[in-house]
A protein has these predicted regions:
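ABC-family P-loop ATPase nucleotide-binding domain
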Residues: 1-19, 328
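A short amphipathic helical element positioned immediately N-terminal to and/or at the very start
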Residues: 19-29, 82-85, 89, 93, ...
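Residue-level detector of transmembrane insertion/anchoring sites
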Residues: 20-21, 76, 307-310
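Hydrophobic alpha-helical transmembrane segments of membrane transport/permease proteins
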Residues: 4-6, 46-85, 269-277
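Small/polar loops that bind or transfer phosphate-bearing groups
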Residues: 15, 37, 84, 127, ...
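N-terminal signal-anchor/first transmembrane alpha helix
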Residues: 11-61, 136-139
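Alpha-helical transmembrane segments of integral membrane proteins
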Residues: 88-329
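Residues marking the start of alpha-helices
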Residues: 23, 79-81, 182, 212
Length: 329
């Protein structure tokens, strides 16, 4: 008998391993997704190592050294401005690396929070059904009919102008200040921008989660769990959410590009994170007036936005293809 059990276990293990291999093989066949993953890994590595690879503090100003060309030597005669300096003499490479840290943190945090809220709302709405489902989903659909960017601009304008009057938990600002290496007063803006992005980011995720719940709750295994006395919470945690993992991963990977663009757009228009805290959006905004005299400034600050948004989309496409059970090997 023990030998029979061992043989059964040995036969089951390759199935699990082979499923992982199948998913990995599907993803690796998507050449653009693989290349994009390497691009994102490089940008994330730069963001993590920003304090190490940046020769200057991103907010330090060298008076009289504004608009230095890439490769110029700093005032101390030792350190080099690899990408030159900006309009007031701040090292551009240092600001780009720290901006990567901030912009990516905003996008990832907003996406994670949106997925969590979307899972909670979608699970409750789909599982309870009836009046609760009708009211919640009509509200979600109404909010989705509103153009998001104009509304985000209005909300951001009101929030940024009145940020002193908005209570933000000190633990959040201190954590963001520590993570992003910025002042706590500047971290308040980061927290508020994340909250603004999340306010609309969870809507699509909630609809996706509701669809999964409506499909799974009528399945035989769900009815069996209910008949055995499993609580509603246990059914949601053990059946609904696990079945939503794959579509949620795809949605999150595709949604990150949107958050990158929205954050950059808000900062570019002066309604997001404010200078001197560097983000790709506010750096591009400051550089646009000097597009012809100093073309490297908008080029350097705009390229990461383009690369990240494109790379996240390609990775999302690759993940979707890899997790699609209908796709042939």
């Amino acid at each position: 008998m023990p030998r029979a059990i061992d043989l059964a276990a040995a036969e089951a293990m390759p199935e699990e391993v082979s499923q992982v291999r199948v998913i990995l093989r599907r993803f690796l066949r998507h050449k653009l997704a693989v290349a994009s993953l390497f691009v994102l890994a490089a940008i994330v590595l730069i963001a993590i190592l920003a304090p190490v690879i940046s020769p200057f503090d991103p907010t330090d100003i060298e008076v009289g050294n504004d608009f230095l060309a890439p490769g110029s030597v700093g005032r101390d005669g030792v350190r080099i401005h690899y990408l030159g300096t900006d309009t007031i003499g701040r090292d551009y490479w240092s600001r780009i690396t720290y901006a990567a840290r901030i912009s990516l943190t905003v996008a990832v945090t907003a996406q994670v929070a949106s997925v969590i809220i979307g899972i909670l709302v979608g699970s409750i709405s789909g599982y309870l059904g009836g009046t609760v489902d009708a009211v919640v989903m009509r509200g979600v659909e109404f909010m989705l009919t509103i153009p998001q960017l104009p509304l985000l601009l209005i909300i951001s304008s009101l929030v940024i102008q009145n940020q002193e009057a908005i209570p933000v938990p000190e633990v959040l600002t201190n954590f963001m200040a520590w993570l992003l290496l910025i002042q706590p007063r500047d971290a308040v803006q980061v927290v508020l921008i994340i909250a603004i992005l999340v306010s609309f980011g969870w809507l699509q995720d909630s609809r996706l989660m509701r669809g999964v719940v409506l499909s799974v709750k009528e399945q035989t295994f769900t009815e069996a769990s209910r008949a055995l006395g499993a609580s509603d919470l246990r059914i949601i945690l053990s059946h609904m959410i696990p079945n939503a993992i794959a579509p949620m991963i795809v949605s999150a990977s595709l949604g990150l590009s949107g958050f990158i663009i929205y954050e950059a757009a808000l900062s570019f228009l002066g309604l997001g994170i404010q200078d001197p805290t560097p983000t790709w959006g506010n750096m591009l905004s400051a550089a646009q007036s000097f597009m012809f005299q100093h073309p490297w400034l908008p080029l350097v600050s705009g390229t990461p936005i383009f690369l990240c948004s494109l790379a996240f989309n390609f990775v999302g496409d690759g993940v979707r293809d890899a997790l699609d059970p209908r796709l042939k090997l």
